[in-house]
């Protein structure tokens, strides 16, 4: 699963997930999966969606993951009283704003890419849409 190799600080404040996304255009592949809603995507969700896409296209073409989970989420153990410091890092997330391209794909027909992205979207906690690369 994805997580940073090293960080300056182990734990982070919760923060807010406002604004609009950087990385809102298809940059590498021909087709993309773009977030319509906002939320946070765990490293497990990123991997589950990637596996679903890879299996559906039978390892043809190329897939790019455009997001990286760089925010640690801490949790205190069950039945532990409040206080005594912040909990341990349990998992990593990536904060997603509307317009962010999550995955890209090339080297497969459009209908196959659409189906693969639908399978991936079912694994994610927010709404997504299929986009194609625009040539300028």
Swiss-Prot record:
InterPro entries xrefs: Ribosomal_uL16, Ribosomal_uL16_bact-type, Ribosomal_uL16_CS, Ribosomal_uL16_dom, Ribosomal_uL16_sf
GO molecular function: rRNA binding; structural constituent of ribosome; tRNA binding
Gene3D superfamilies linked to this entry: Ribosomal protein L10e/L16
An annotated GO BP: translation
Record's keyword terms, sorted: Ribonucleoprotein, Ribosomal protein, RNA-binding, rRNA-binding, tRNA-binding
Coiled coil: none
Gene Ontology CC annotation, any one: cytosolic large ribosomal subunit
Keyword Ribonucleoprotein (UniProt): yes
PANTHER family per record: 50S/60S RIBOSOMAL PROTEIN L16, LARGE RIBOSOMAL SUBUNIT PROTEIN UL16M
Family, similarity comment: Belongs to the universal ribosomal protein uL16 family.
Its biological purpose: Binds 23S rRNA and is also seen to make contacts with the A and possibly P site tRNAs.
Subunit structure as annotated in this protein's UniProt entry: Part of the 50S ribosomal subunit.
Protein name per the record: Large ribosomal subunit protein uL16
Organism field: Alteromonas mediterranea (strain DSM 17117 / CIP 110805 / LMG 28347 / Deep ecotype)
């Amino acid at each position: 699963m994805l997580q940073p190799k090293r960080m300056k600080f182990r734990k982070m404040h919760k923060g807010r997930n406002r604004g609009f996304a950087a990385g809102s255009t298809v940059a590498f592949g021909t087709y993309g999966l773009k977030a319509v809603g906002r939320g946070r995507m765990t490293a497990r969700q990123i991997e589950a969606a990637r596996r679903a896409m890879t299996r559906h296209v039978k390892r043809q073409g190329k897939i790019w993951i455009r997001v990286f989970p760089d925010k640690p989420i801490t949790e205190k153990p069950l039945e532990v009283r409040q206080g005594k410091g912040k909990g341990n890092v349990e998992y990593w997330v990536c904060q997603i704003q509307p317009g962010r391209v999550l995955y890209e794909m090339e080297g497969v027909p459009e209908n196959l890419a659409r189906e693969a992205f639908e399978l991936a979207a079912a694994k994610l906690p927010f709404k997504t849409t299929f986009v194609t690369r625009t040539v300028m």
